């Protein structure tokens, strides 16, 4: 499956910008709340197989997460922008991997959507997440 890029006319461009602006405004407070990552939905562990410290983050435990399923890509983009993490896609899980300078070891945030994303085929090809740096492993 190939993504075909076409130039938007002015009306389409304006409508798309309006949609993104509305979606962003509606989800920003929820995203900011996610970034607090309280301990009840966040746990560090050492993965002996990959030899990496991992941070398991389960957004489903947050009551607002099911209310914005169509905006997960905004949340992912925002997390990537503010954290600077490289994004690796593995099935229904998204791994954010970043070198931890203080510790000298890589840290990993594993965000598991439990296959709630509808178009996984599109997601794997990067069609839904715009500028995210998605790499299949």
Swiss-Prot record:
This protein's major location comes to: virion
Q: Does the keyword Cytoplasm apply?
A: no
Quick check: keyword Electron transport in the entry?
Answer: no
- A single Gene Ontology CC term: virion component
What triggers its expression? Expressed in the late phase of the viral replicative cycle.
The UniProt keywords, alphabetically, are: Host cytoplasm, Late protein, Virion
Q: Where in the cell is it found?
A: Virion; Host cytoplasm
As for what it does, the entry says: Plays a role in the inhibition of the host innate immune response. Mechanistically, promotes the autophagy-mediated lysosomal degradation of host TBK1 and affects IRF3 nuclear translocation to block type I IFN production.
Q: How does it assemble?
A: Interacts with host TBK1.
Family listed: Belongs to the asfivirus A137R family.
Q: Which named protein is this?
A: Structural protein A137R
């Amino acid at each position: 499956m190939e993504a075909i890029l076409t130039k938007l006319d002015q009306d389409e461009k304006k409508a798309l910008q309006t949609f993104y602006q509305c979606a962003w405004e509606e989800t920003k407070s929820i995203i900011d709340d996610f970034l607090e990552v309280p301990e009840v939905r966040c746990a560090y562990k050492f993965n002996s197989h990959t030899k990496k410290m991992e941070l398991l983050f389960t957004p489903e435990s947050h009551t607002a997460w099911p209310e914005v399923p169509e905006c997960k890509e905004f949340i992912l983009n925002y997390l990537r922008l503010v954290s600077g993490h490289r994004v690796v896609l593995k099935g229904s899980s998204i791994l954010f991997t970043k070198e931890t300078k203080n510790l000298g070891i890589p840290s990993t945030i594993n965000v598991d959507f439990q296959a709630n994303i509808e178009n996984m085929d599109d997601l794997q090809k990067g069609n839904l997440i715009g500028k995210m740096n998605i790499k299949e492993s």
